[in-house]
Amino acid sequence: MSGRDVIFVVGMSRSGTSALARVFSLCGGAIPLELLPPNFANPAGYWEPRHAVEINDAFLEAQASSWHDARLTLQLRPTFGPLQERFMTEIVEILARGFQPDGPIVVKEPRITALLPYWTAAAVELRLRPVFVHIFRNPADVAASLFARDGLSVEHSFALWLKYNLIGERDTRGLRRIFVSYEEVMHDWEPVVARCAAEVGIEVGIDDAIRSAVGDFLSPALHHHRASAIDETAVDPLMVAWVARVYAVLRRASEHRIRMSALDQILCDYVDSGRADASFLAPTA
C-alpha cells in the first residue's frame, strides 16, 4: 500500500462530490468495497464507503454535532483524547482494507471535509500519498438542493456551504490539491480530469470506452435544483456577502489564482461576528 495515491474528494454535500468520485473511479480509481446504496436523493449512487459514513456520524454525534452542524466549534477548537484516537484507528482500517486493490483510492464522503486532519493523518500513517480535489458549486444551487432534500433554510445552507468550503480549503494548504467547479465537471469532464492528472499527478486512463461510460453516467438529470428555486431576501446580508466572496475566490482558484489571505479574512470576520457559533446553526433532531 505504501506510495499509493488516495484521492480525497473535498466539498460540500450537493456540490457534485458523488459525480466527481464516480468519474475518477471510471477512469481507473479504486472504489469502496462496501458502498452506501443509492436512494431517491442520489439515484445514480453516492460512491462513498458505507463504513466511513457510519464512523464519521458516530464521531460527530459523540461531540453533539452532525453533518448539518454549521457551527465551527470542532474545527476551530479541536481536542485529542480517547475518542479521537479510536476514530483514527477506525479510519486507518477503512483506508487499509475497504477499497479495491488496484488504482488510486477514491475517497468521497462530504463529512470528511469537516474532519480532514484525521483522515489526512491516517493516510500518511499508512504511507499513502493524499491528494485533494476540492469541488465547489454555486451556493444558491446547493441551498435549493438542500431545501428539496432536507428542508434546510437558505441561511442554514449558506452557513454550511461557508463552513465546508472555508475549512476544506484551510485544511489542505501545503498539500497536493486542485480546485474544480461542479459546472466544469458537468459541462466537460475530460479537461477537468486531464488537469487533475497534469497538476497534481493523479494517475488516470481515458479511452473511448471510458468516455462512453462517463458520458452515460453524467446525464443532464444529475444537474438539478437551480438557484431560481430559492429566496435570498430573508437571509442575513452579511452571510450573503461572505458566501458571494468565497464563491468568487474559489472560482478564481479553479483558474490557479487562489487568494488564501482573502479566505482567511472572511473566516476571521465570520467568526468574530458570532454567527459561526449561532444557536440556529446547531444540528436538530
Regions found by a protein language model. Name each.
Residues 1-88, 214, 220:
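PAPS-dependent sulfotransferase catalytic core
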